[in-house]
Curated annotation (Swiss-Prot):
Keywords: Cell membrane, Disulfide bond, G-protein coupled receptor, Glycoprotein, Membrane, Olfaction, Receptor, Sensory transduction, Transducer, Transmembrane, Transmembrane helix. The lineage of its organism: Eukaryota, Metazoa, Chordata, Craniata, Vertebrata. The chain crosses the membrane at residues 24-47, 56-77, 99-118, 138-156, 194-217, 234-256, 268-287. It comes from Homo sapiens. Disulfide bonds join 95-187. It is found in: Cell membrane. This is Olfactory receptor 4C16. The keyword Iron-sulfur does not apply.
Length: 310
């Protein structure tokens, strides 16, 4: 691909240029990132070590937590460091890596949420065939397809970014590199690229969201014929999933279906989508799922007993 770039680095303006508020941003992002790592790593370790968390639902929860951790790590550490600097610059290649990694793990999370919805439907509505339909082999294949699909999606995004000529200026009014703010730095017409962006990212977000909400409406409607115990079990796992879907897809759809129009809240929405949801997801899942909470208690009980013996 022929590149026509005079820009070797970009200047990120971040959330604020005020030194006082930059310190506040540093503290908030650092706490959110540490909380994200702690919460998701607890889920990852619990699923891997607990025999009670070996069914397909927790297999997908494991990869959802891994995806949350990687998505946050691809963006948040850089924003934490930038909050301490007077002038924040990012090289062109690092910017492209950030675009690629954020879209890989963001898209992977979308696919995992879809797989989790399918898993919940089969578990509640077809319990006798659950282990046959959602077998370990099927879970592995579905996850491999999700990874491949995420990488293909991200390669398309990188192709779109690299097809644009950047001649300057190189100041990006954003917290991190993404296609929407990058489009504004291109020194050529970006209408076609913008349409491709919307048809790629926007369509994936919007269609997946509609499918998930529609599937849960059907799923919850089918529960009326089940016993109170089955309904309680379904709601205990599905409510948390629905909350995560709404929190994740709302900002995602907003960012990638607004045709490069900048609103004052754009940066805040992007931060919530990449940082906030990764922090909230483990909190929501552990608060609403008794099996995960029980496994975590046992894990920490064993740790405390081991420490006491020493």
């Amino acid at each position: 691909m022929q590149l026509n770039n005079n820009v070797t680095e970009f200047i990120l303006l971040g959330l604020t240029q005020d030194p006082f508020w930059k310190k506040i941003v540093f503290v908030i992002f650092l706490r959110l990132y540490l909380g994200t790592l702690l919460g998701n790593l607890l889920i990852i370790i619990s699923v891997k070590t607990s025999q009670a968390l070996k069914n397909p639902m927790f297999f997908f929860l494991f990869y959802l937590s891994l995806s949350d951790t990687c998505l946050s790590t691809s963006i948040t550490p850089r924003m934490i460091v930038d909050a301490l600097l007077k002038k924040t610059t990012i090289s062109f290649s690092e910017c492209m890596i950030q675009v690629f990694s954020s879209h890989v793990f963001g898209c992977l999370e979308i696919f995992i949420l879809i797989l989790t919805a399918v898993d919940r439907y089969v578990d509640i509505c077809k319990p006798l065939h659950y282990m046959t339909i959602i077998s370990q082999w099927v879970c592995g294949v579905l996850m491999a397809v999700a990874w491949v699909g995420s990488c293909v999606h991200s390669l398309v995004q990188i192709f779109l970014a690299l097809s644009l000529p950047f001649c300057g200026p190189n100041v990006i009014n954003h917290c991190f590199c993404d296609l929407q703010p990058l489009l504004k730095q291109a020194c050529s017409e970006t209408y076609v690229v913008n349409l491709l962006l919307v048809s790629n990212s926007g369509a994936i977000c919007a269609v997946s969201y509609v499918m998930l909400i529609f599937s849960y409406v059907i799923f919850l409607h089918s529960l009326r014929n089940h016993s109170a115990e089955v309904i309680k079990k379904a709601l205990s796992t599905c409510v948390s999933h629905i909350i995560v879907v709404i929190l994740f897809f709302g900002p995602c759809i907003f960012m990638y279906t607004c045709l490069a129009t900048v609103f004052p809240m754009d940066k805040m929405i992007a931060v919530f989508y990449t940082v906030g949801t990764s922090f909230l997801n483990p909190v929501i899942y552990t608060l609403k799922n008794t099996e995960v909470k029980s496994a975590m208690r046992k894990l920490w009980s064993k740790k405390l007993i081991t420490d006491d013996k020493r």
